[in-house]
């Protein structure tokens, strides 16, 4: 029985994108794509890759401005706001650094 408990405790969390975060990302990518489609795709790929890495080290980034969240900066201008529990990392928002948050 102890062995099963150890496996559950050491399980890697899953990644869950909230609807608001997906909408944020799409809005950012579409805005950039108007001038530079390649840069938009590169940014999208980087944000998605960095977000995927959060399941391995979810507590790596600083506490967020809202209690219970953390914030990961991507390319100095974008902030991925997320929360985590034992089983899931929730991507809550993807924001430009100039946006008012919260």
What does each model-found stretch correspond to?
Residues 23, 27, 49-52, 56:
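Generic recognition of well-ordered alpha-helical segments
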Residues 21, 47, 82:
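GIY-YIG nuclease signature motif recognition
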Residues 6, 78-79, 83-102:
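Enriched for short, Lys/Arg-rich terminal
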Residues 56-87:
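Basic/aromatic recognition patch in beta-strand/loop cores that engages polyanionic ligands
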Residues 15, 25, 43, 54, ...:
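Generic leucine side-chain signal with a strong bias for well-ordered alpha-helical environments
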Residues 41-44, 48:
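Short, well-structured alpha-helical segments
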Residues 31-34, 53-56, 60:
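Conserved amphipathic alpha-helical interaction elements at protein-protein interfaces in regulatory
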